[in-house]
């Protein structure tokens, strides 16, 4: 059907005729996501007419059809202007049942009308900064949270709940002020935690342990999984700075309650491997936002038959995180987005919980036996992580190195032993530890256990490559002293030329363990030696 015909019919305002042409238009354009530039002005006019038409007293079926047309038009970012006015957004939010009002009694729209209105709002808010600003001013988040609070009392269809949560996610992702309003004024962390608990349908065995039947937990149904993931995304947005600030006991209890639910999310699967991976990914992202002291709930559950026990502690959740990490490593896709959250989570957990660190150390860095291959060669988890230490992405290589460094109790010698000095140099240089030593950290004094194979090979291991190198013939064998001196000077001159032309910059290690240009390093060492001589009265 010609667009101008649709526009003319809508302009006439006759309800039955409008309903008929819009039904045809919606059917023809239901899968249309790209639009011709030639008809842009016609679409804008149609959008204006539809918003005005929707303000009239219409039958629910006509409202739904009109909203379906608005949803189709809202896919075109060049036609959003009629929808991004105060009046337009108020009309849509009223039909969605979420317009902010101080009145206690409000008319409840038809459920299909609510659903289509929510879909329209999601499209418009996602694409229009002006709409985002107006929804913040209109306090739509208040109306949304009021309805979410009633999920336990009202029987709403899955799709309405899903798009409620999707709209809330978009608002909190795109507007810092709405994020803060939900977290603080509307007590959003508590509300969304309760909503997650309701969605998962859990029962509690202890304050921070979800009750489970013996054996494998059944997969979370598809609809509940979809809603749970939207809730996790909203919670991620409003807890973004939680790990960086101190929390009082009341907040700590709330975060521990949430952490226990997230542990349960890790322990269950969704409908299919891909959906489970996505569900666990959102769970890991949110766990990384929790205050560090609240991560102890990952280890809280008692050891039961079938649990993975280490040092008397239930390590099921930590082991699942480690398996999740290895799957992400093997997939090798978008490493920064997929790896850094779980690496950071495991690193911080290992830093603050001794049992977690020792368990991860046993899994990732078992006592060395293979000393013939470089640390980055092979298929073990250690090999895969060491390979990341020279990754092109700075964040990825830093996270991998930091994780292994913490497992080594931030001991330089132990770190070099497992990774090789060449791989370790980046982190050591950044930390000012090139001269060796150890970072400040609270770690137990247990010793690293060396295998017989490692002890036997240790004198022959090249610290740079981290393996026993084959003995190569001496290139200077058979040379006279004059020839050796000539080759040495030739090498010095080559380095000097490269340095003067600024192709390379010779670096040295300062007494503090930092890298510095060679002349600076030599000067610092001379100053320190002079200071030492003065202290000894050798002037």
Curated annotation (Swiss-Prot):
Residues 521-532 have a biased composition (Basic and acidic residues). It holds the Pfam family Ric8. InterPro entries: ARM-like, ARM-type_fold, Chaperone_Ric-8_A/B, Gua_nucleotide_exch_fac_Ric8. It is found in: Cytoplasm, Cell cortex; Cytoplasm. GO terms for molecular function: G-protein alpha-subunit binding; guanyl-nucleotide exchange factor activity; protein folding chaperone. Signal peptide: none annotated. Keywords: Chaperone, Cytoplasm, Guanine-nucleotide releasing factor. Its main location: cytoplasm. Residues 507-539 are annotated as: Disordered. GO terms for biological process: G protein-coupled receptor signaling pathway. Belongs to the synembryn family. Chaperone that specifically binds and folds nascent G alpha proteins prior to G protein heterotrimer formation, promoting their stability and activity: folds GNAI1, GNAO1, GNA13 and GNAQ. Does not fold G(s) G-alpha proteins GNAS nor GNAL. Also acts as a guanine nucleotide exchange factor (GEF) for G alpha proteins by stimulating exchange of bound GDP for free GTP. This is Chaperone Ric-8A. It comes from Gallus gallus (Chicken). The gene is RIC8A.
